[in-house]
């Protein structure tokens, strides 16, 4: 499970990430990444007291993916895939980065390994160099 401090819950931040972030897609997911600045005033929205500066992630899993059970299972797989990618040493997320992962219908039938690979690839391409 993804720790609460890494979850994106603000509607405003979801919208800001989707509108202003970099978008990369694959067969199973579309990933929007809005990199925060290195200083607090450059962050998309201020960090709440006690929040981590690590990446925060939100999911969009529409009815096109499947019924409620399928959407929930897909959400769980994507949350775990993001956590696996986040824990890798090869990716360096800038302070205050927000990520929105939108599941495509093929994500419902994809294996966990495929989802991890697609999420990793999309985030790597979307992060600033």
Swiss-Prot record:
It is an enzyme of class 3 (hydrolase). InterPro entries: Ribosomal_Su5_D2-typ_SF (IPR020568), Ribsml_uS5_D2-typ_fold_subgr (IPR014721), RNase_P (IPR000100). Its EC number is 3.1.26.5. Gene3D superfamilies: 3.30.230.10. GO terms for cellular component: ribonuclease P complex. It catalyses: Endonucleolytic cleavage of RNA, removing 5'-extranucleotides from tRNA precursor. Keywords: Endonuclease, Hydrolase, Nuclease, RNA-binding, tRNA processing. GO terms for molecular function: 3'-tRNA processing endoribonuclease activity; ribonuclease P activity; tRNA binding. GO terms for biological process: tRNA 5'-leader removal. PANTHER family: RIBONUCLEASE P PROTEIN COMPONENT (PTHR33992:SF1). Consists of a catalytic RNA component (M1 or rnpB) and a protein subunit. This is Ribonuclease P protein component. It comes from Corynebacterium jeikeium (strain K411).
